[in-house]
């Protein structure tokens, strides 16, 4: 993340903390006050992305979204050992077939 993106993010957090509506003009004025040069496009992008959203609520819900996806990951992980066991059985079967081919007669060795 570039310095201008980071500064714009911090400016949005400051505005949200104060309960002020997040607009591109306000983001630019905050970044200018912090002596950070930001292209106006970044302020516009951040303002449109956060328009009509409660930034504090979004930040509070970050942890709950991670907890909800954890059981899904655990379910997918449980399938992996079963697949590995099937692959091992197939490999063992192939090894047995190969060992049957070499009976040790060695007629033409």
Curated annotation (Swiss-Prot):
Record's protein name: Large ribosomal subunit protein P1C
Region (Disordered): 68-109
Annotated GO MF terms: protein kinase activator activity; ribonucleoprotein complex binding; structural constituent of ribosome
Cellular localization per UniProt: Cytoplasm
Assembly and interaction partners: Component of the large ribosomal subunit (LSU). Mature yeast ribosomes consist of a small (40S) and a large (60S) subunit. The 40S small subunit contains 1 molecule of ribosomal RNA (18S rRNA) and at least 33 different proteins. The large 60S subunit contains 3 rRNA molecules (25S, 5.8S and 5S rRNA) and at least 46 different proteins. The acidic ribosomal P-proteins form the stalk structure of the 60S subunit. They are organized as a pentameric complex in which uL10/P0 interacts with 2 heterodimers of P1 and P2 proteins.
GO biological process, alphabetically ordered: cytoplasmic translation; cytoplasmic translational elongation
Source organism of the structure: Schizosaccharomyces pombe (strain 972 / ATCC 24843)
Major localization class: cytoplasm
InterPro entries: P1/P2_N_sf, Ribosomal_P1/P2
Miscellaneous comment: Yeasts contain 4 individual small ribosomal A proteins (RPA) which can be classified into two couples of similar but not identical sequences. Each couple is distinctly related to one of the two A proteins present in multicellular organisms.
Keywords, in A-Z order: Cytoplasm, Phosphoprotein, Ribonucleoprotein, Ribosomal protein
Skewed-composition ranges (Low complexity): 68-83
UniProt record similarity statement: Belongs to the eukaryotic ribosomal protein P1/P2 family.
Record function comment: Component of the ribosome, a large ribonucleoprotein complex responsible for the synthesis of proteins in the cell. The small ribosomal subunit (SSU) binds messenger RNAs (mRNAs) and translates the encoded message by selecting cognate aminoacyl-transfer RNA (tRNA) molecules. The large subunit (LSU) contains the ribosomal catalytic site termed the peptidyl transferase center (PTC), which catalyzes the formation of peptide bonds, thereby polymerizing the amino acids delivered by tRNAs into a polypeptide chain.
Residue numbers of Phosphoserine PTMs: 99
One cellular component (GO) term of this entry: cytosol
One Pfam family matching this protein: Ribosomal_60s
Gene: rpp103
Biased composition regions of type Acidic residues, renumbered to the chain: 94-103
């Amino acid at each position: 993340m570039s310095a201008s993106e980071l500064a714009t993010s911090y400016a949005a957090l400051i505005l949200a903390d104060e309960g002020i509506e997040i607009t591109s003009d306000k983001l630019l004025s905050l970044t200018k006050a912090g002596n950070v040069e930001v292209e106006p496009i970044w302020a516009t992008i951040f303002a449109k992305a956060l328009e009509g959203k409660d930034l504090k609520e979004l930040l509070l819900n970050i942890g709950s979204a991670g907890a909800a996806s954890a059981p899904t990951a655990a379910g997918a992980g449980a399938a992996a050992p079963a697949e590995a066991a099937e692959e091992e059985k197939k490999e063992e079967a192939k090894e047995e077939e190969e060992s049957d081919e070499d009976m040790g007669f060695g007629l033409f060795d």
